[in-house]
Amino acid sequence: MRAYERLLKYAKVYTTSDPESGTHPSAAREFDLAHLLVEEMKSIGIEDAFVGEHCYVYGNIPATKGCEKKPALGLIAHMDTAPDAPGENVKPILHENYDGGDVTLPGTGMVMKTSTFPFLKELKGETLITTDGTTLLGADDKSGVAEILTAAETLIKKKLPHGKLCIAFTPDEEIGEGASLFDIPGFGADFAYTVDGGDVGGIEYENFNAASATVTIHGFSVHPGSAKDAMINASNVAMEFHMALPVMARPETTEGYQGFYHLCQMYGDVTEAKLGYILRDHDASKLQFKKDNLLHIACYLNGKYGPGTVEVEIKDSYRNMLEKIKPHFHLVETARKAIEKAGLTPEEIPVRGGTDGAVLSWKGLPCPNLGTGGFNFHGVCECTTVERMDKATEILLNIVELYSK
């Protein structure tokens, strides 16, 4: 079975994670795909495959004769899809011999324009996979799951030489919980790759340092007819707080290594208002500056409106994996060779986000990220191609081969 065929099957299983649940996994529906994968893994020869109580799927392929002393390599992908767009009743559509032009998604009439998505022109002649426009596709990261299992099936069927291969599929990556209960000792790998990136040929070993902040503003309500010099409108103070942050440090005004403050949520009335932010920067010192800046703004507003008017709660989320990858840079060098062997040019760009691998790297499992061949994640214009998924699978096989020598 080719990787895209697996993706078409997995995409139809509803696995959107739930950021509000507070449970592990965040949604019981994630077990539906987990059980399907365990069954499939056993059918291709991964005899010890199982899913644990928190919806982590694990399985191992023992080393072939003569490769027992080679390092144990891990491959990891996540099963959940992002809650940013609908993920139920996904209807994948194959556009064979795609002409490189605008694509109309029939479920909504939405048009994926090449002027908006210039990369589409580069996909001309390939078999493009989209949805009907009513849901996301789930290529993030069911394409990674599909590519790992297709590579595993190839290794077993063709009896290719390899060291121990450790496979894991995680829940809740999209809500930042994918690595929280990952069993690194039980997984058994010396190092690993997550297969959760964008276009095929990508290698990601730098990511944001991340934090979140909740700003709570306590107002004082007075009848508006007699409010002069008495009312403190929490919603107005919230707007004042937000406008004190730099306009040019927002997601929509930054790129590359530029960090940002992102206002994700806001609500309020006269009595109370709340602002929810995520803070991101590749440089840990610059992230600390952003955290300090929020506190300084709160201090200023408390001086203006009274102590306790503004409260800021900051939580660290994940850290840049680069520091933990540098001592194991063979992972990057091997990935480069594997990509070149597949006839592609490696592309190494900083991740403007995070991966399970970033958290796992800091927990002791060095884990850069590889491209899957997908585009436009987290939205209804998400897409991939048959050919790029095949290439991603080939790259995984090349990595396994290189570590077996």
Where are these regions (language model features)?
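N-terminal capping segment at the start of a domain
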Residues: R2-A28, I129-T130, Y318, H378-G379
